[in-house]
Amino acid sequence: MTISHIDPEYQANTIEPSVQQDWENRKVFKVADTVEGKHRYILSMFPYPSGKLHMGHVRNYTIGDVISRFYRLKGETVLQPMGWDAFGLPAENAAIAHKVAPAKWTFENIAYMRDQLKKLGLSVDWDREFATCTPEYYHWEQWLFVQLYKKGLIYRKLSTVNWDPVDQTVLANEQVENGRGWRSGALVEKRDIPMYYFRITDYAQELLDDLDTLQDGWPQQVLTMQRNWIGRSTGMEITFPSANTEIYADGLTVYTTRADTLMGVTYVAVAAEHPLALKAAENNPELAAFIEECRMGSVAEADLATAEKKGMATGLFVKHPVTGEELPVWIANYVLMSYGSGAVMAVPAHDERDFEFANKFNLPIKQVIDAKGADDADYSATEWQEWYGSKEGKLVNSGEFDGLEFQAAFDAFLAKLEPQGLANSKVQFRLRDWGVSRQRYWGCPIPMINCDTCGQVTVPEDQLPVVLPTDVVPDGSGNPLNKMPEFYETKCPCCGGDARRETDTLDTFVESSWYYARYASPDFTGGMVKPEAAKNWLPVNQYIGGVEHAILHLLYARFFHKLMRDEGVVQGNEPFTNLLTQGMVLADTFYREAENGKKTWFNPADIELERDEKGRIISAKYSGDGQEVIIGGQEKMSKSKNNGIDPQAIIDQYGADTARVFMMFAAPPDQSLEWSDAGVEGANRFLKRVWRLVASFLEKGNSATAIDKANLSKDAQDLRRKTHETIQKVSDDIERRHAFNTAIAALMELLNASNKFEAKDDNDVAVEREAITTLLTLLAPFAPHLSQTLLAQFGTDLTEATFPEVDASALTRNTQTIVVQVNGKLRGKLEVSVDISKDELLAQAKALPEVQQFLTGPTKKEIVVPNKLVNLVV
């Protein structure tokens, strides 16, 4: 083989564009819908086309690309696709601000970001790219909606919702933060509007059970979060008969997981929207006003738990199902109409919220559990916390039920009340049905028609997709579709009469709940996904994304997979076999604070820093005026803190390979990564050293390739051992541990060993060549442009290269390093044969000149730790 020559200096900006062009010309990452042999589907969560990449994107997609390239080297066919989560509020709001159609804004952003992603060197099959805002995509989302509506898995109901008055849309509970909209920051109101819901609760048990099948592939933290969100509980429904049958004939039914505390109920609380509350308020203006006040508050559980407890007595009473005692009914702002029956039995002595409420409104507090085991223990406000929530104690102050523990009490109350029709055992879930209607324009049209005669009617399948007009420029005043008769005026498919098309659009979580399946056959026109392609590629082998998606996106995608399975679209029960949740990217923050407390944030690129000898920042000045700014510490890169680092600037200055290596080396993937300019420079220096090593080797012009294993020098044996140990470690670090940082550290060690090695004959040259080509191949998942360019000098095309095999014989050691101590202190080292005898080892240790000077007195003890050390005690 002829050895080539290369420029002595690494020029990323020269080599990277040509390598990327080569990949594109040869379509080396294109895969078929069905393939033979070993294959794998690696997917990073697709981006929202916000306008430009941020470092979180770079980290996410580099992780996916490292894994993809690794398995290609292992001989597998790998599908790694890319697309765009293109509907949603930000596009609409940007369109309002810039007076441009969201479609135009979105597709311009996609074009720019696609170019950025390609410059990162991702091994993506770009022929599978799609945007979720195209009719070709959402056609099949609408098709599924129609099927599910016909099966009763989607329904429409009037709902009290969180209404964001600025964004003019409904917010999920999770999108309300401290009573304000997560995006606009506006105070959230409550409104009653008709909405479409997915019956995700029909799948609650299966969604919970199937988490067990993900035990080996998903982070424990995510599984726990999903279990808690689904929130299965086994409890009892108990009915409290009405004491005011002339006003409210029905009793109040409550759900409780603590039926054992029934004898401690001192009042019953209902939600403001409960029918009993509304009945009581009919002739009570004060109560009606209070109900309205509650309605205007948040409906998010977290907010209700921490909000000030507010309440008002309805003047109505119910009877205790065991004693017949009359208990007052209160309206309480901490009771949710959407959970259980909208009513709770209040046991202030054994529930934190009830306790707080009872203290505020001077309601009785009756202890019925004694956690200490003393039957005569009286309730004490100071001791209350000790047995709040305890299931260990026995019942007290509970009449015939005294002395029973939790399960026995549960069974006894059920046995007493169930024959009277006042109780039954029930499993309940915290999970609520998924409201998907959004009162915005830039989303997938809901394929429903409202007819005065026929009610809600699905759009016929041959009329799908219902296409969203794309030439609309929203002005911010509600949904523009409501002002477009050309969109909403239609005929009823049932009676042929005039009808109105639904103008609400779908929650954008719907698009991201099935996109992974569409990638298997993005051009398929006969359904959501081609059956044989789904069978070939699904489920996704490795999914990568931020832990902030642990609950909603991942739960909805799991739900959709089951919906599609039940429609015969896909097989299997779960969409993602393995999940990697990467940590955030942090960067330094700098600001100035005005007298009114308002902070102005400065981008790190505009700051001149002074550091101490340990590299810590001791002063920072804004380059615009030379004046000092306050150092705010490291926080997640964000627009609000203006501390984002533009990936394009890093690529322009250092190249994509440097950005990739830094991102993978700076921290384990599941932990936060602290941005460091010095770290980027360090990654770049590493790649320059690799380049110089290869340039130096090629310069010598020796083409020896055959290794004579039987006649290796000790230095050559050491380098071969290091080479094959590195193969072993990098393989394990990438495949099993996802410890990309330690894989790169191992490559740095191999680089150092190769640099120190001095070849003295052809055998040495062949060993050095093996080390260098191995280094380049193992580095390829991290720095593919550099690796492809340099491997070509050795006659290897990276796109056809294979992961090096470990030579077990190279790992065996003929010699070992032994530490020699005198009285426990290091005095010398020996390089000896691995099968040296104990006597010979001691003799060589004592013969070391640097040891002999300390052997002045008689030797009391000779300690030999095999393969490690000799300690001579004198």
From Swiss-Prot:
Keywords carried by this UniProt record: Aminoacyl-tRNA synthetase, ATP-binding, Cytoplasm, Ligase, Nucleotide-binding, Protein biosynthesis
GO molecular function (one): ATP binding
CDD domains the record matches: Anticodon_Ia_Leu_BEm, LeuRS_core
Reactions performed catalytically: tRNA(Leu) + L-leucine + ATP = L-leucyl-tRNA(Leu) + AMP + diphosphate
Taxonomic lineage of the native organism: Bacteria, Pseudomonadati, Pseudomonadota, Gammaproteobacteria, Moraxellales
Gene3D superfamilies, per database record: 2.20.28.290, 3.10.20.590, HUPs, Isoleucyl-tRNA Synthetase, Domain 1, Valyl/Leucyl/Isoleucyl-tRNA synthetase, editing domain
GO cellular component term of the entry, any: cytosol
Record PANTHER family: LEUCINE--TRNA LIGASE, MITOCHONDRIAL, LEUCYL-TRNA SYNTHETASE
Location relative to the cell: Cytoplasm
Chief subcellular location: cytoplasm
Protein family membership: Belongs to the class-I aminoacyl-tRNA synthetase family.
Transmembrane segments: none
Protein name as it appears in the record: Leucine--tRNA ligase
UniProt short sequence motif 'KMSKS' region, positions renumbered to this chain: 636-640
Enzyme class label: ligase
Binding site for ATP: K639
Pfam families named in the record: Anticodon_1, tRNA-synt_1, tRNA-synt_1_2, tRNA-synt_1g
NCBIfam families cross-referenced by the UniProt entry: leuS_bact
EC nos: 6.1.1.4
Biological process, per Gene Ontology: leucyl-tRNA aminoacylation
Residues spanned by motif 'HIGH' region: 47-57
Entry superkingdom: Bacteria
HAMAP family (alphabetical): Leu_tRNA_synth_B
